[in-house]
Amino acid sequence: MRVGYLGPAGTFSQQALNESLKFAGLGDDAEVVPLATAHDVVSAVQDGLVDRAIVPIENSVEGGVNEVIDALVHDAPDVAIIGEYVLAINPCLIVREGTALGEISTVYSHPQPLAQCASYLRRELPDASLQPSNSTAAAVAEVLASDQPVAALASPAAAEQNGAVVIAESVADHELLATRFIWLSRDPLEAAAQEQAGKSAILFSGAGDGAPGWLLDCLSEFANRSVNLTRIESRPARLELGQYIFLIDIDGRVDAPGPAADALAGLAAHCEQVRVLGSYAV
């Protein structure tokens, strides 16, 4: 079994993978495959290069990870979400040995940690430039390759694995920082007979999305059956300006008989496109 994740070694994605292998039905003998970008991870599942993969989908501060969402919506029609795992995040400021805090001229990291630590960076490093990297571990590699006084935002594990130094611990602006990761596969996990407990992720888009009340009509299919929505957001449909695809998470599995499945059938009557991204136990 080949399992993809956002690499290189030392990323929060690798930490989430290691902590949740058993939840995905995988053993310690799984072959883990680090990939350069989150889009690459999703594409590797779509193209059959890996059997399963884990990617970040949502953060408690910055919200949805658009790179992953767009990859699922537009570039991975055969990929399904089969599970999720929530990881507490503790980004640290990491440097080469001998670099002082006041010397730091540039901070590298994935865009999410840069945003999650924005207040700290403005306060402690107001003159430092912020440079996005493909991943937190890649940011540490950039620090070690530089002869300038630069830093990275990454996990303590990334510092330890690469021989770097943590100069400031837990620098996120919010104490309860967490990221929700999703497990992906080309083979959806079937619900047990009559099993309704769990979660489903659904995307949908118009026919009547330009009409007043259309979105209300769509969501009423769930409210009228007492199906709880836990998340909703929209992404551009990549057609005309102002056209969107909506994504929702709901409590309940739509691949087993019950209110969630009935609501999905009702939703289809209002839409041109409805796709179940995943229906899985939690």
Task: Give residue spans per PLM region.
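Domain-level signature for soluble enzymes in the chorismate/prephenate branch of the shikimate pathway
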Residues: 1-282
